[in-house]
């Protein structure tokens, strides 16, 4: 993500003459109005803690579906929410639905936490990909996918679709849950 964003910012600077100042040593881009864009990771608690301290008017988390719930919830609730408070800032999360349909990003999207605004789109909604429809039909045919195939629905339609086949430990409520009442004191 960092490399992609860094290169994209460089392309935008050249295309639009934004007069951005790139500081590669700390992955910071200075804007002419005095604002900064800081790129970095948050894969573990040490990296999350590096975001403590400054105030942010906007914090953006890309590929949020890939982050462990404990890390993402700590980053948002313990670090970024307090850091955006002073400037009445915002936190944006982006990502593609994951195969497990679980985690902080899933909960924020599906259960519509009151503080989160939801937005979604499909590959076909992108106006910069004029051949996307034909490409996607070829991809579906090459892979033997139909409109119900979980990877197709997640990656190209942006839908939360649990994919039991891609799980390390496949869980099925029919197979793994037993409906029975235990005798009182069973666990004693």
Task: Report each predicted region and the residues it spans.
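ASCE P-loop NTPase helicase motor core
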Residues: 66-145
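Walker B catalytic acidic pair
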Residues: 62-64
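Short, surface-exposed connector motifs at secondary-structure boundaries
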Residues: 56, 60, 87-90
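Catalytic micro-motifs at enzyme active sites that drive phosphoryl/nucleotidyl and oxygen chemistry
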Residues: 47-50, 80-81, 106-107, 179-180
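ATPase catalytic-site recognition across NTP-hydrolyzing enzymes
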Residues: 127-188
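Short, conserved catalytic or adaptor-binding loops enriched in Gly and charged residues
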Residues: 28-32, 107-115, 176-182
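Inter-Walker segment of RecA-like/P-loop motor cores
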Residues: 2-57, 160
